[in-house]
Amino acid sequence: MITPKVLSGFKDRLPKDAIQKAQLLAKVSVVFQSFGFVPIETPHLEYAEALLPDASSDIQKEIYRFKDHGDRDVALRFDLTVPLARFVSLHHQILGMPFKRYAIGNVFRGERAQKGRYREFTQCDFDFIGSESLVCDAEIIQVIIASLKALDLEDFCVSINHRKILNGICEYFGVSQVNEALRIVDKLEKIGLDGVGEELKKECDLNSNTIKELLEMVQIKQNDLSHAEFFEKIAYLKDYNENLKKGIQDLERLYQLLGDLQISQNLYKIDFSIARGLGYYTGIVYETTLNDMKSLGSVCSGGRYDHLTKNFSKENLQGVGASIGIDRLIVALSEMQLLDERSTQAKVLIACMHEEYFSYANRLAESLRQSGIFSEVYPEAQKIKKPFSYANHKGHEFVAVIGEEEFKSETLSLKNMHSGMQLNCLSFLKALEIIGENDEDL
């Protein structure tokens, strides 16, 4: 006999968990659609050559790669952005540019399993393809903020940086292995200053003084300074080189656009340590953390990539986008008690006291559904205790009881499972009025 078990880093979703996830995805999808983003789908499995060029060395170690039955070198996607590059290159003439898309799907990384981190997890990506305008970058940040607010989150911060600033810092300190250095800097939160310093010394052959000064610069943060105060503080960096000058100018323009959108300044700050480990980022980058749960890591991250299709097409298409980590958000929202704890989406359970009442019960359930009330019929004629126990376990708000009197008079008795109050022999319209008082729970 096979012992039922799940691989480490993977998980089953019980009904309650699956409902919570579906509700979150529905909410963020509405936000995406409200900004004009349209859905697409790409396969879980791609040719390995399509995925590997843009993966950092760390992520390449985590990719699930194998030979399929046709002896082809294939891999499970590790994010939704690289498949997007292949998708856009294949279909760009049909899509038209600029193109705004969102995609929701599972991705796979063989990283160490821990709280809020899985080897299979769901990403919600939204991207603006085919425009180099910073208006697009500002809109992506606007969508991040709107999405988190749609999930009833208010206390978070989008930490923003620019890859040109990081490139400029590396240039200033004479770092030749820029991508490798930035990959290491991106691990600052995970391994700390000492760990980053050791790796920079080992992998990039930097001396201790250079490492010390470089790390001091990448730790520059806006913190509680106003936008104007911060840009005044870092203005001297524009004189160091063109990369730093261009990066800071782009951030100044971005902040002007975000200000025009009247987004609260508490929700976004500049942080020079934000690097994003994926090698395809070229411009503004960002990571979003919940202020009271920073140990969970970024719940939404992304940035600009100006060479999206370079591996697939001579026609260069740039883009900017972000990815919401739904699984991490579920962990956070659960701890904050902001999730629906029911194991059913049906608001009403209809219970029959006798077999012959099922035809009436089914008609009643269908009438409720047509009125927008999710309903189900308990499948067995039982003493009332068993359906009530079932409703308590699943989380139905109401139980409609059909006994002899209700059957004959074509009424129903209705019990509120939260308050315990029961009203007998109600007309359908009266019951509908009572049930519909809390439609936001549907």
UniProtKB/Swiss-Prot annotation:
Alphabetical list of PROSITE patterns matching this protein: AA_TRNA_LIGASE_II (PS50862)
One GO term describing the cellular component: cytoplasm
In which domain of life is the source organism classified?
A: Bacteria
The record's listing under InterPro entries reads: aa-tRNA-synth_II (IPR006195), aa-tRNA-synth_II/BPL/LPL (IPR045864), Anticodon-bd (IPR004154), Anticodon-bd_dom_sf (IPR036621), His-tRNA-ligase (IPR015807), HisRS-like_core (IPR041715), HisRS/HisZ (IPR004516), HisRS_anticodon (IPR033656)
Which terms does the UniProt entry file under GO BP?
A: histidyl-tRNA aminoacylation
Query: What keywords does the record list, in alphabetical order?
Result: Aminoacyl-tRNA synthetase, ATP-binding, Cytoplasm, Ligase, Nucleotide-binding, Protein biosynthesis
Query: Could you confirm whether the keyword Manganese appears in this record?
Result: no
Q: Where in the cell is it found?
A: Cytoplasm
**What GO molecular function terms would the record report?**
ATP binding; histidine-tRNA ligase activity
Q: What is its main location?
A: cytoplasm
- Reactions the enzyme catalyzes: tRNA(His) + L-histidine + ATP = L-histidyl-tRNA(His) + AMP + diphosphate + H(+)
A matching Pfam family: tRNA-synt_His
Q: What is its EC number?
A: 6.1.1.21
Q: Subunit composition? A: Homodimer.
Q: Which family does it belong to?
A: Belongs to the class-II aminoacyl-tRNA synthetase family.
Name of the protein in its database record? Histidine--tRNA ligase
The organism is: Helicobacter pylori (strain G27)
Q: What is the lineage of its organism?
A: Bacteria, Pseudomonadati, Campylobacterota, Epsilonproteobacteria, Campylobacterales
Gene that encodes the chain: hisS
